[in-house]
Amino acid sequence: MPTVLGLETSCDESAAAVLRQEGDQLTVLSHGIASQVEEHAQWGGVVPEIASRRHVEALPNLVEHALKDAGLIAADLDAIAATVAPGLVGALMVGSITGRTLAALHQKPFLAVHHLEAHLASVFLADQPPKAPYLVLLVSGGHTELIRVDQRGEMKRLGRSHDDAAGEAFDKVARLMGLGYPGGPAIQAIAVEGDAKRFRLPKGRVSKPEGGFYPYDFSFSGLKTAVLRHVEALKRESEELPLADLAASFEQIVADVLVERSLRCCLEQGIDQLVMVGGVAANQRLRSLMHAVGQSKGVSVHIAPLAYCTDNAAMVAVAALRRLSSGVKSSSLELGVSARWPLEKALSLYGSTPPF
């Protein structure tokens, strides 16, 4: 029954969680998050220096409460895991140094976790997790990717955004509309009352050099520009902005694009299971549409529980537990952090020779 303490500090959420695994059963013994959303909202986005400072302040208390709520002491743990890449370097260092220090102090294995692998692992906290092979739609503030996971756990990216991630587009459009930060929850809140068919917005596509389009890739920068033009035109006409209709139209087109390309990829690649994870996976319109269209096309859809869509430490612990189950022993205590590191190289985070 391995028990792992997970730490997450890759961006603006400080988190600590303790999870235990018995066979295929995962139990969240404790799970705490200290959000910085309100502090960063006044700046319209995450300020890295502030984020790092708040992690330093919050993480020790989160670790203390995670162990206390789980009814454990550090000696009871089998391993300690922390996110080390990708993310804000200063923020990542707080979690990594904390995790490595605790591991050294209590003589426990340290597992360095890739942030995107942790998001992929979040679906295993659902009641009915998938069985490989499956396709993952990772959709968040920093990433929009389609990733195939095979029976051996190997990952291959089949599609990606060439500019803004979907979550980034939500933030930018919300700012254009004066809705504040973070954009996803703000847009969802008012879109409920809006007419999603009022404004025609583009489904951005990515052209191939030889002609045609990449079928599984995404582009959201043009969509953001289209919303801006509608806003400017309405202001020139001295009309009150129909915020609910704009929000609903934008939210619907993003959901349509994500669902259409994800399921097309499944069908053309012969995959009958789709996993959706990441912060944008919390969007209710997207969740409902993905389930409905997936069912109509014979694709089983698995979505991370709402509580574990945005950045959290439970998903870090799950990723670590899955690595332990696969035979991984530990990561080097000399391993640093990296702002960028491809998901395909996540396995390099384990072993005696650190990649950075």
Curated annotation (Swiss-Prot):
Q: Which UniProt keywords apply?
A: Acyltransferase, Cytoplasm, Iron, Metal-binding, Transferase, tRNA processing
Reactions catalysed, semicolon-separated, are: L-threonylcarbamoyladenylate + adenosine(37) in tRNA = N(6)-L-threonylcarbamoyladenosine(37) in tRNA + AMP + H(+)
Q: Which Gene3D superfamilies match?
A: 3.30.420.40
What does the entry list as the binding residues for substrate?
A: 138-142, 171, 184, 283
What does the entry list under GO cellular component?
A: cytoplasm
Q: Where in the cell is it found?
A: Cytoplasm
Biological-process GO terms, alphabetical: tRNA threonylcarbamoyladenosine modification
Q: What Enzyme Commission number(s) apply to this enzyme?
A: 2.3.1.234
In its UniProt record, a GO molecular function of this protein is: iron ion binding
Mind telling me which PROSITE patterns this protein's record contains? GLYCOPROTEASE
What is its cofactor?
A: Fe(2+)
Annotated Fe cation binding lies at 115, 119, 311
Q: Which InterPro entries match?
A: ATPase_NBD (IPR043129), Gcp-like_dom (IPR000905), KAE1/TsaD (IPR017861), Peptidase_M22_CS (IPR017860), TsaD (IPR022450)
**Which family does the entry's similarity section mention?**
Belongs to the KAE1 / TsaD family.
Cited function: Required for the formation of a threonylcarbamoyl group on adenosine at position 37 (t(6)A37) in tRNAs that read codons beginning with adenine. Is involved in the transfer of the threonylcarbamoyl moiety of threonylcarbamoyl-AMP (TC-AMP) to the N6 group of A37, together with TsaE and TsaB. TsaD likely plays a direct catalytic role in this reaction.
What this protein is called in its record is tRNA N6-adenosine threonylcarbamoyltransferase
- Which organism is the protein's source? Synechococcus sp. (strain CC9311)
Q: Which gene encodes it?
A: tsaD
